[in-house]
Amino acid sequence: GELAAELFTVPGKVALYLEGEAPALAAETGANVGVEIICGARRLAYVPGAAGLPPALRERLAGADVILFDATLFTDDEMIATGTGAKTGRRMGHMPLDGADGTLATLAGLGGRRILTHINNTNPILIEGSSERRQVEAAGFEVAADGMEIVL
């Protein structure tokens, strides 16, 4: 079938070099986007960075056959806890996977294939067999891997 792509706004923040003293961390300004790839009746939504999941974005994702979604950090304070950074995930414009308003909870119930991508090297879901990896897999998510191919 014919292939098409459409950009859509995703809550996020501006690039670090554009930040002022008090940057908007979950703004929908168009500075942060996702892309929907459409092939015939099949749809893939790619959201490499997301600071939140408002109803309109969840509705868009609900119709996708495949969702590739930001999984930068498992917990919001992961960078601080591991000593690898001073900012929380939300401060960097990324929802954590865990927690009541994290990615696992907010994407729960959506159909289709849900694949986690844009994974920071501190994120324990990268470790096969870790409790965090088992948690995301039990929730119906896949962890993206280098060289992964997706057929719509």
Residue ranges and their predicted role:
Residues 30-32, 40-43, 51-148:
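Cap/insert and terminal regions of metallo-dependent hydrolase folds
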